[in-house]
Design a protein with these regions (language model features):
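Conserved N-lobe ATP-binding subsite of Hanks-type protein kinase domains
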Residues: 105
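A conserved loop-to-beta-strand element in the N-lobe of protein kinase catalytic cores
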Residues: 153, 162-170, 178-179
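A short, aromatic-enriched beta-strand patch in the conserved N-lobe beta-sheet
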Residues: 157-158
Length: 455
């Protein structure tokens, strides 16, 4: 069962009475396309924007089933070029539905003039207005339009019609990380596999914080797999941004042989929000208490994610929401035996230490609360991890691709037939809406085409 983010009434938890929870509906949103960028040093990206780094392609893997090569992409100060939108709904042909949520759906589409496959996220304006989710769509576009990172899904086009908002994104043919875990023995990874993906997620969170954003909804359902097996974060509608972000600080290295690190905490220092958002099993204690939260919630969710990757379940899951919240508030994390086939292995002391420090109940004492990602990356658990070269290493999960472009979507669950199919051919782009901004709550949603170096 895929877990959905919600905003329940948490005050009743502290008042010791049954909470009045809103009804839940199943929600899933997936975003995708073919060619991701390669990983380069975040320190050089931020502190020396004139420096370009390019890495060679990930080699093809042997075997009967074909795995697709990635192309070379260069990072530089002009690696994203924004132009007036050059496409519309009728520029694409729907292939199949990949996922759906309460306000929209995600389709695999093919661009007519290039035959390239993309993931098209289509959001209903009517449903967003009805559910008060307009700001979420605007926040997601802001993050996607300004992000350029190998572990964050790439946006190529965004536009709107009279009734819908459109995001045309990277099609990650490896599918949903949640599904990949569910299909593994024990629904989990060994320690080295969990460490690898934890490192990639940490790098992505570091970049988001550097840009002034708090993710706030990290979970396996919001992570996609590129065809090479590397992760791609998606679904940023619950993210919160600081505009402009604070300036990054510098953390001196503990050894003269090591380079300094970036203090990303200073980029989001002024960002504190009281919104009750997140996914039940991943919500941090300070969110439940309703006392406001900061970027520390992202490090809490990282701790929950690492635990789930290792044990196939979350550490504080209860029989119901109220019990789960109570355990989050008052229970200390316990480490059971790993499921088969890893039951004879014991989690290392550094692994337990990392999870305990990430799941500290006090956000001010939690790992990452001082210097952000620099604190997490310097933990002994990641001692042998070269974060700058993650994109060159072989991931623990290698998705099998039957067809080179992934058009058969073998790594996605089969969706039921649509009751009302969206007709892309008859939906026209709204070219100009500025004259009607008083009556159009989506006036700030930008129609744009983004070009990336190497495309």
């Amino acid at each position: 069962i895929r877990r959905v983010a919600s905003a329940p009434n948490a005050n009743s938890l502290n008042a010791h009475r049954p909470p009045n929870y809103p009804a839940q509906s199943q929600s899933q949103s997936q975003s995708q396309h073919q060619n991701p960028p390669h990983y380069s040093s975040l320190l050089q990206m931020k502190l020396n924007s004139s420096t370009s780094e390019a890495f060679s392609s990930v080699p093809a893997f042997p075997g009967q089933l074909q795995r697709v090569r990635s192309f070379r992409r260069t990072y530089s100060s002009n690696s994203i070029k924004v132009r007036q939108v050059e496409v519309g709904p009728s520029s694409f042909v729907k292939i199949r539905m990949l996922g759906k949520g309460d306000v929209g759906k995600v389709y695999m589409v093919k661009q007519k003039d290039t035959d390239k496959l993309f993931a098209m996220k289509v959001l209903s304006k009517r449903e967003m207005i009805k559910r008060n989710k307009i700001k979420r769509a605007l926040a997601e576009q802001e993050i996607l339009a300004t992000s350029n990172h190998p572990f964050i899904v790439t946006l190529f086009h965004s536009f709107q019609s009279q009734d819908y908002l459109y995001f045309v994104m990277e099609y990650c043919m490896g599918g949903e990380f949640f599904r990949a875990l569910q299909l593994r023995p024990g629904k989990c990874l060994d320690e080295e596999g969990a460490k690898f993906y934890a490192a990639e997620v940490t790098a992505a969170l570091e970049y988001l914080h550097l840009q002034g954003h708090i993710y706030r909804d990290l979970k396996p359902e919001n992570i996609l797999l590129h065809q090479s097996g590397h992760i791609m974060l998606t679904d940023f509608d619950l993210s919160k941004g600081s505009s402009p972000p604070g300036k990054p600080g510098v953390v001196k290295a503990s050894s003269p042989n090591q380079p300094p690190s970036i203090n990303t905490k200073s980029c989001v220092n002024n960002l504190r929000t009281n919104s009750f958002v997140g996914t039940e099993e991943y919500i941090a204690p300070e969110v439940i208490k309703g006392c406001g939260h900061t970027s520390a919630v992202d490090w809490w969710t990282l701790g929950i994610l690492i635990f789930e990757m290792l044990y196939g379940t979350t550490p504080f899951k209860g029989a119901n929401r109220n019990e789960t919240f109570s355990r989050i508030m008052f229970w200390e994390v316990k480490f059971p035996d790993q499921p088969a086939p890893y039951q004879n292995r014991t989690l290392s002391s550094s692994g337990k230490s990392l999870i305990r420090k990430l799941l500290h109940k006090d956000e001010n004492s939690r790992l990452g609360s001082c210097a952000g990602a620099a604190d997490v990356k310097s933990h002994p658990f990641f001692k042998n991890v070269n974060f700058a070269l993650l994109r060159h290493q072989s991931p623990p999960i290698l998705p099998l691709i039957h067809k080179s472009n992934g058009i058969d979507a073998v790594n996605f669950r089969r969706m039921p037939p649509e009751s009302m199919s969206l007709d892309l051919e008859s939906d026209d782009v709204m070219v100009s809406i500025h004259n009607d901004h008083k009556n159009n709550p989506f006036e700030k949603f930008s129609s744009m085409t983004l070009y990336h170096e190497g495309d």
